[in-house]
A protein has these predicted regions:
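Class I S-adenosyl-L-methionine
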Residues: 1-120, 131-133
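Short, Lys/Arg-enriched alpha-helical microdomains
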Residues: 123-126
Length: 133
């Protein structure tokens, strides 16, 4: 599947961890898709000429996923909870949705990190723990 997006939106989709553009869109799309940035499109390619640049992105469905998330809606909700307070530490949000035993199952996790400091796999683990309840 190939789509064209506004450059800024596209950067949020294909950004990798860690980067300043990394966030909800990156995490959710990368769960199901391999994402390949193809090329940028100049505003001069359109009439009337827009004030923005565009990017073409190729989405390739993943055949094998390392995490099996049964309810993708939970991943959307979890990333929404964390990234709505992007500059806050994860400890309060994590304690709202998981008990201490579940938090320990995630592994060696520093609760003073911010949402953008967590790799996508951590969000997949959290979602998996929520789904198993």
């Amino acid at each position: 599947i190939i789509f064209m997006f506004q450059k800024e939106v596209g950067e949020k989709i294909y950004s990798k961890f860690p980067s300043s553009k990394y966030g909800r869109l990156s995490i959710i799309t990368k769960y199901r898709l391999n994402i390949v940035k193809k090329f940028f499109v100049s505003p001069n390619c359109f009439f009337p000429k827009p004030k923005i640049n565009s990017v073409v992105i190729h989405f390739i469905p993943k055949i094998q996923k390392y995490y099996k998330i049964e309810n993708l809606k939970n991943l959307e909700e979890i990333t929404n909870i964390f990234f709505s307070n992007k500059r806050k530490m994860i400890n309060k949000n994590l304690k709202k949705i998981l008990n201490m035993n579940d938090i320990k199952k995630i592994g060696n996790l520093d609760l003073k990190l911010r949402p953008s400091d967590l790799e996508p796999e951590i969000y997949y683990k959290i979602t998996d723990l929520i789904n198993k309840r």
